[in-house]
Swiss-Prot record:
Biased composition (Basic and acidic residues): 200-217, 817-836, 1029-1053, 1124-1144, 1230-1240, 1252-1275, 1290-1326, 1436-1452
Residues bearing PTM Phosphoserine: S420, S423, S492, S626, S781, S894, S963, S1097
Coiled-coil zones: 277-303
Cross-link (Glycyl lysine isopeptide (Lys-Gly) (interchain with G-Cter in SUMO2)) at residue(s): K282, K879, K1117, K1175, K1181, K1198, K1215, K1233, K1249, K1291, K1309, K1413
Disulfide bonds: none
GO molecular function: zinc ion binding
Upper classification of the organism: Eukaryota, Metazoa, Chordata, Craniata, Vertebrata
GO biological process, one term: negative regulation of transcription by RNA polymerase II
Compositional bias ranges of the Low complexity kind: 51-61, 162-184, 1182-1193
The protein's role, per its UniProt record: Transcription factor, which represses ZNF609 transcription.
Positions bearing Phosphothreonine: T480
Keyword set, alphabetical order: Coiled coil, Isopeptide bond, Metal-binding, Phosphoprotein, Repressor, Transcription, Transcription regulation, Ubl conjugation, Zinc, Zinc-finger
The protein's name in its UniProt record: Zinc finger protein 608
Gene coding for it: Znf608
Length: 1511
């Protein structure tokens, strides 16, 4: 096809150009183009060079007569369209082209007018669909996606240009396309030639088929556009029919491209049958407006196959600028010699490439639209066996470092089959975002573009897989629907609109680093046929993209969204409609289409799972999720995992078709995110379960099957997942907000256990425990059902970023959980079962809690929290990934990523060092831990996993169920949910860090392995307990029995894997630590930041000190009341206080013994083995857990008590060591990389932990020792408050008296902590709390928390806390507090839950309410738990609850905490931890803890002191 960019175009009307409306093609291009940063830039430059040098807009009127389908010399139209190459009078076009060449995005955005936009759009759109074009499309799409936002013109550019850009047709066409492509296009065009060769091969096949299909189009198109490659004219080069035909040529290819020709596009559009929708171009000429056109085009958007090969008309980048609209109309003949030349050059490939580069140009692009397919080029920094891929990629001229999670192993990405995050977002947008709100131009093409951009990211993830996947990338799924898109798009003009939703999924599959320029286009191989940009290969892609070529229409009455994958639809429904009707649609469709489409996805998931390649869950392009699983088995897991924006679709890849079929359903049911992770894990466990999980989301929307299927099918497999799902279901019910995530949340929810269990099994090499866990999770499955409501929360726009964070958190948690599970293989499953029960019991409570969380999260806090640092920037994207939040939950089960990744940071986790890169990849930049913290989204994952992937799984899932809450609460709460997992990895990762120094041996070995065993169990337990506690009031007895059984079992299991010392610690810790671990972990994870805050913020310090005093008082009261039990609830304030004091006195005795150990824990951490420090922590934690878990674990309590006794002994040892250390002046904490005060805080952490741990045994023992209680109460307070220094009995005895001494220490600590977490606490707490009033409340609270470890611990974002990681925080008094808070959190779930739920929601948002409530609940729950250890728990629980309630109410609003979570790095888990951990995360206890831990992990990751990051 000679690249005759016929001058005919000259005669073409500007309208024609307008009609050409690049929007369509651009969109298509976006679909096909995966933004290749380097490629784009290169192409841009190349194209500019080409255009400038060979500005010859070829007359290329040859094709004018070509397939006369266009009637008039398509060449004319093409020429016109190509005229842009020759900078002639096409003023509008010229501007557009110029802009296009310069910044197509801008042009599209400015949408110059249909005419202007259209000309360039036409040029872009015209870009040949040749194979290269397809590639270009893939590449250009990401940029185009953005461009798409701008305007149709841009869309065309993106669509048509996209392909051509990639294709570059390696000939004049490439150049011409470059010209047409303009800047953005040229970007891609530069590599376009290369693409032409590579892409051409691939695109050629597809494009050629299409070309053959649309050869007549091509004839005209060729005539019209010198880039007459077969593919090229596809764009509607045969737009000649349209009259001017200039636009139509584009139309042919882009479907909308023709639209560029305005009315003519319509004519051409039919010609551009290939483009399918391109035909749909409905005479956009009338709609000359670029945006309108884009919308229309978008709707009509050429089929995903997209034949993006916008004819080569876009001859040269310079041409684009050169060609003015007038030029366009004026010259039908030689648009410009340069164009001709370029076209001629390009023509041979038949891949007419129009560069969409402009759209892709970073300068011209705003934030990428969700669902934009992106081709990322970069370097793999690290890949772990857990499916974490750390990459340094260039996109839009910006370099990104990220962690990609293997979708297969980590399922916390948007549903793989969600056709487009954009669509779902739009649907969700109904909630808060305009449908197209996400699209800058509000053009469907734009959105598609964004979706595909996401897919492009996914491409990176696809890795080598990219080639096969390539086809799936379409502007709107152009690529994605090679089968689907063409037919679907063709079938329904509006399908383009929908298509934008679907393609991202498919794109995601493609988007892998391998996808980059050469491989990216080729990636379609996985997809099989869909290699052609035109999407001719409909079968292959059909399978992946959708069960049938036809897009699945949203059954909702008022919704015309179409999805290639049922998952996309499900996601959309869950988020947008959340109606039972969706459920029907989803279910049948799901079963049907997901069977087909997700079959590949499942396969991919399986493949990914096997190869650890795809992080399906991680695929955050919930919308694009369709292709997500498609990564070939060999695809690096990290690759897939990376694209949080667009990877979701990856799951839907065709690679695993046969295996994926079974899995496809699973995935389908799992709704992609769970699918991959769950599929991976569940693949091991059971495809059916996965299916159910996948179904869960839709069921979630339905609220029917989810529970049933989840409960039944995923019972063993996804106890946690189910749990989450139940919560989701409940949340969903409670909060209809669930926009699109409805389908996903169940996945996410399903994933937690599945991930915890199955994912863990699949994710980490040490998966054995995972499998066991999975089985064990079976009991939880029914309880998981209540979590279903989660989607509702997910629906919250705010949740979007948090969703991403959640996903990452989940992933991390999952990893962590995996590790934890490994270590706690035996214990984990029991925990899981226990969790299941707890979840079941507290599903409702959790739901409420989740609801509150959702509400709070709904507040900007959820967003702030969830959107950590970079998450905020990705908010739109994350919004699109609300689904991903669910996916995060889904991913949460990927402890591999969470655990491994998190632990990776410290490379402490059993051979998890690789995970550190994951952390880095996971956007936790600083160290490995820092790396995981660096990126909010990744940080969440890291932190979540680090903080307690396990709990986060459950809790995080539940949190995810309450999306917003999970957003920060998942950030906070995911971490909270995964305290064990998180703590363990955190510890591991922080094992090098001083916080984990002692903990490393303990937590890393003990906690890590046993801890992992126990952490997942504990994490699960924590999550479970969080849910448990929530439900505890509901099913306190049942839970107690079961939980205790589980706890004892867990203790046994945990103990068995653990070393004796570790065993005792973990056993103790597993029951007490299981929850306390989460909590303490969080506390520890947070505590470091507190110091930073204190140090950094005098105000905070003041407030904190005051608060600390109050808290100590409250804590004392609470500890007493909490220790006291539920029975004393009435008299808790007085009696329990006394009892608590006595108990605390006794306990402080041990605590004091351990108190010296508090510094010692650092030392002993290393020395005694983390066991002793752990014991100290565990003592505090034990107290917490005691109150919290005593209910939960009667048997466990006994076992734990034994271990507590051991721990007490060890604590005494530690106390000696600590004392010597203290006396020696060696700050045990110095062992931890933290300032002395921070270490002091660490001591606090440890001492409370020990106190907590000792609490169960000391409850008995110290009840005996009541004599010692006067002295010990102060001690305990001291231990709790200022364990490190003020462990002396004096401190606790007079709360205030102790305050002076202890407060000196504690104030120092607090100051340190404040310095440490000034931003965190100051922001979260200072802002949140009246310094004096909350302090008074928090005083008892703090006392309960041992000097308010959480406030200190509360600053997980603080490096100290981060370094401490959830593990430290877990054991440390924060642990106690955590259980305290946890208890309130759980307590909230329990008796108080309902009443406190409202408070909790504020709590989540406001520390004040949160703390008061959490404390109340804490007390309540503590009472429940402390029924086992009556005295301390009761008082602590009740009193603390009360005080916490007041305290929290006035202390700080959750918004502040949320804010901190939002600044994940800054606040990390720290911000809401104290209140949030207690009350705010009553429903989200684990989530809060997880979030806190995330912050803590982040703190360590972001440097020892998050304060730096915090600020």
């Amino acid at each position: 096809m000679s690249v005759n960019v016929s001058t005919a175009g000259k005669g073409v009307d500007p309208n024609t150009v307008d009609t050409y409306d690049s929007g369509d093609d651009w969109e298509i291009g976006v679909g096909n183009l995966i933004i290749d940063l380097d490629a784009d830039l290169e192409k841009d430059r190349q194209k500019f060079e080409m255009n400038n040098s060979t500005n010859t807009t070829t007359n290329t009127t040859k094709d004018c007569g070509g397939p006369a389908s266009n009637g008039t010399c398509s060449t004319s139209a093409l020429a016109d369209g190509l005229k842009f190459a020759s900078v002639q009078p096409s003023a509008p076009q010229g501007n557009s082209h110029k802009e296009t060449s310069k910044s197509k995005v801008k042009r599209a955005k400015t949408s110059k007018d249909a005419n202007k936009s259209l000309p360039s759009a036409a040029l872009y759109g015209i870009p040949e669909i040749s194979s290269t074009g397809k590639r270009q499309e893939v590449q250009g799409r990401p940029g185009e996606a953005t461009g798409m936002n701008s305007a149709l013109g841009q869309s065309v550019s993106g669509g048509g240009s996209s392909n051509p850009n990639s294709n570059g047709t390696s000939t004049g066409t490439s150049a011409a396309t470059a010209g047409a492509g303009s800047c953005g296009k040229s970007k891609e065009e530069k590599p376009g030639k290369s693409h032409s060769s590579r892409g051409a091969k691939r695109d050629k096949d597809a494009a050629r088929s299409r070309k053959e299909k649309h050869d007549l189009l091509q004839g005209h198109q060729n005539g019209g556009g010198g880039q007459a490659p077969s593919g090229g004219h596809l764009y509607g080069f045969g737009t000649k029919s349209n009259g001017s035909g200039a636009s139509p040529f584009h139309c042919g290819g882009a479907g909308s491209g023709s639209v560029g020709a305005a009315g003519e596009v319509s004519k051409t559009a039919p010609d551009s049958t290939l483009m399918g929708n391109s035909m749909l171009v409905k005479k956009e000429e009338e709609e000359e407006e670029s945006h309108r056109r884009i919308k229309k085009l978008k709707t009509e958007k050429v089929d995903p196959l997209f034949t993006v090969p916008a004819p080569p008309p876009p001859i040269a980048s310079s041409l684009a600028p050169q060609i003015p609209p007038s030029y366009f109309p004026p010259s039908s003949s030689n648009i410009a010699a340069p164009v001709e030349q370029l076209l001629v050059r390009t023509r041979s490939v038949g891949v007419n490439t129009c560069e969409v580069g402009v759209v892709t140009e970073p300068e011209c692009l705003g934030p990428c639209e969700p669902g934009t397919s992106v081709n990322l080029e970069g370097i793999v920094w690290h890949e772990t066996e857990e499916g974490v891929l750390v990459v340094n990629v260039t996109w839009r001229n910006k370099t990104y470092v990220g962690t990609l999670l293997d979708c297969t192993k980590h399922d916390w990405a948007p549903p793989r089959f969600c056709e487009s995050p954009t669509s779902d977002l739009e649907m969700r947008g109904g909630r808060g975002r305009g449908k197209r709100a996400r699209s800058a131009a509000a053009a469907p093409g734009s959105e598609v573009s964004f979706t595909e951009s996401r897919g492009l990211q996914s491409k990176n993830r696809g890795g080598a897989n990219g080639k096969g996947r390539r086809g799936s990338l379409n502007a709107s799924g152009r690529r994605t629907p090679p089968n689907c898109a063409a037919e679907d798009i063709k079938a329904s003009p509006s399908s383009t609109n929908k298509r934008k939703n679907k393609p991202p999924m498919e794109l995601d599959l493609n988007s892998s680093s391998e996808d980059s320029k050469p491989g990216k286009r080729v990636r379609t191989n996985s997809r099989s046929t869909p290699t052609t940009p035109q999407g001719k290969p409909e079968t292959t892609f059909l399978d992946q993209g959708c069960s049938s070529p036809v897009l699945i229409d949203c059954p909702h009455p008022n919704c015309n969204k179409k999805y290639k994958h049922i998952n996309g639809l499900r996601y959309h429904q869950a988020h947008a409609h959340l109606d039972p009707e969706n459920k029907l649609e989803f279910e049948p469709d799901s079963e049907d289409k997901i069977s087909d489409c997700e079959e590949a996805l499942s396969n991919v998931a399986l493949e990914c799972n096997e190869s650890s390649t795809s992080v399906s869950s991680y695929d955050q392009t919930k919308a694009p999720g369709s292709p997500g699983a498609g990564n070939p088995p060999g695809t690096p897991k990290g690759k897939r995992e990376h694209v949080s924006n667009g990877p979701g679709p990856i799951i839907g890849s065709k690679t695993g078709k046969n295996s994926g079929k079974k899995r496809g359903l699973n995935n389908e049911l799992n709704n992609l995110p769970v699918i991959s992770n769950m599929t991976a894990a569940l693949d091991i466990c059971s495809a059916t379960d996965s299916n159910l999980t996948a179904e869960m989301p839709k069921l979630e929307a339905e609220g029917l099957i989810d529970k049933k299927s989840l409960g039944d099918k995923e019972k063993g497999k996804k106890a946690n997942n189910c749990k989450m799902d139940k919560n989701l279901s409940k949340l969903k019910s409670a909060r209809p907000i669930a926009p699109a995530p409805a389908p996903t949340p169940p996945q996410l929810i399903a994933i937690p256990t599945a991930a915890f269990t199955s994912t863990t099994t699949g994710t980490i090499p040490g998966l054995p425990s995972l499998t066991t866990t999975v089985v064990q999770a079976t009991p939880k499955s029914p309880p998981l059902k209540p979590i279903q409501p989660k989607p509702t929360i997910m629906g919250e726009p705010i949740t979007v970023n948090p969703a991403l964070v959640s996903l990452k958190d989940r992933k991390k948690k999952e990893k962590r959980k995996l590790k934890d599970k490994e270590g706690k293989e035996t214990g984990g499953p029991k925990m899981d079962a226990k969790l299941g029960k707890l979840e079941e019991a507290k599903a409702a409570s959790k739901d409420l809690s989740g609801h509150f969380l959702k509400d709070h999260l709904g507040k900007s806090e959820g967003l702030a929290n969830g959107l950590s640092e970079s998450q905020e920037s990705r908010m739109a994207s994350i919004k699109a990934e609300a689904d991903k939040v669910y996916t995060f939950t889904d991913n949460a089960p990927s402890p591999s990523i969470g655990s491994a990744s998190r632990m990776e940071c410290s490379t402490l986790v059993n051979g998890q060092a690789p995970m550190a890169p994951l952390h880095v990849l996971t956007q936790n930049g600083a160290e490995s831990a820092a790396a995981k913290t660096s990126s909010p989204a990744y940080s969440d994952i890291s932190d979540a996993a680090d903080d307690g992937g396990s709990d986060s799984r459950s809790e995080g899932m539940r949190s995810k169920a309450s999306s917003p809450s999970d957003t920060f609460s998942n950030k906070d709460g995911v971490v909270k949910g995964h305290p064990s997992t998180s703590a363990q990895p955190s510890q591991l990762k922080e094992s090098h860090s001083p916080y984990y120094h002692g903990y490393e041996p303990y937590y890393s070995p003990s906690y890590m392995h046993p801890g992992q065993v126990g952490a997942p169990a504990a994490g699960n337990g924590g999550s479970t307990q969080g849910m448990k506690i929530k439900k505890e009031s509901e099913e306190d007895a049942e839970k107690k029995d079961k939980a205790e059984q589980l706890e004892s079992k867990k203790v046994d299991h945990t103990s068995a894997p653990l070393q004796p010392q570790h065993q005792s610690v973990i056993t103790q810790r597993h029951p007490a630590l299981a929850q306390s671990l989460y909590y303490g972990q969080y506390a520890y994870g947070l505590y470091m930041d507190q110091k930073s805050l204190m140090a950094t913020s005098p105000a905070y310090r003041q407030q904190y000190e005051k608060y600390y005093e109050d808290q100590r008082l409250a804590e004392q009261k609470m500890a007493q009341s909490g220790r006291g039990d539920c029975e004393r609830k009435a008299e808790l304030p007085l009696k329990e206080l006394g009892k608590e004091d006595n108990k605390q006195k006794n306990m402080p005795s041990a605590t004091i013994s351990k108190a010296p150990s508090t510094p010692e824990p650092n030392k002993n951490h290393s020395k005694l083995g983390p066991s002793v420090p752990n014991k100290t922590e565990e003592t505090g934690k034990s107290q917490l857990l005691s109150s919290h878990q005593q209910q939960l674990q009667a048997d466990s309590f006994k076992a734990k008590q034994m271990e507590n006794h051991q721990l007490i002994k060890e604590a005494v040892e530690m106390k000696s060591v600590m004392d010597s250390m203290k006396q020696t002046g060696v700050d045990p904490t110095s062992r931890f990389k933290q300032d002395p005060e921070s270490r002091t805080w660490h001591h606090y952490v440890y001492q409370p932990k020990y106190l907590d741990q000792q609490k169960p045994e000391e409850l008995d023992r110290e009840k005996k020792l009541k004599e010692d209680s006067p002295r010990k109460t102060p001690n305990k307070e001291s231990g709790v408050s200022s364990l490190p220094v003020s462990l002396t009995n004096i401190k606790e005895e007079p709360k205030e008296g102790k305050r002076p001494d202890s407060q000196s220490v504690e104030e120092n600590k607090l100051k340190n902590d404040d310095r440490k977490t000034p931003v965190n606490w100051k922001d979260s707490r200072g802002t949140r709390v009246a310094v004096s009033s909350p302090m008074s409340q928090h005083q008892s609270y703090i006392q309960y928390l041992h000097a308010y470890p959480y406030p200190q611990m509360y600053d997980p974002s603080h490096p100290a806390y981060r370094a401490v990681s959830p593990v430290l925080m877990h054991s440390y008094p924060g642990a106690y507090l955590s259980p305290g808070f946890h208890y309130p959190v759980y307590g909230k779930m329990s008796g108080r839950e309902e009443a406190e739920k409202v408070n909790t929601s504020p709590s989540i948002n406001t520390k004040t309410a949160s703390e008061a409530k959490a404390l109340d609940l804490l007390q309540h729950h503590a009472n429940q738990y402390r029924s086992k250890s009556p005295a301390p728990v009761e008082k602590a629980s009740t009193e603390r609850e009360r005080e916490a309630e007041r305290e929290r109410d006035r202390h700080s609003p959750f918004s502040q905490r949320h804010l901190h979570t939002h600044h994940h790095t800054h606040v990390g888990m720290g911000y809401p931890l104290i209140p949030g951990q207690y009350d705010p995360f009553q429903g989200l206890t684990s989530a809060a803890l997880v979030a806190s831990q995330q912050v803590a992990a982040q703190a360590s990751a972001s440097g020892m002191f998050p304060a730096q990051r915090r600020e």
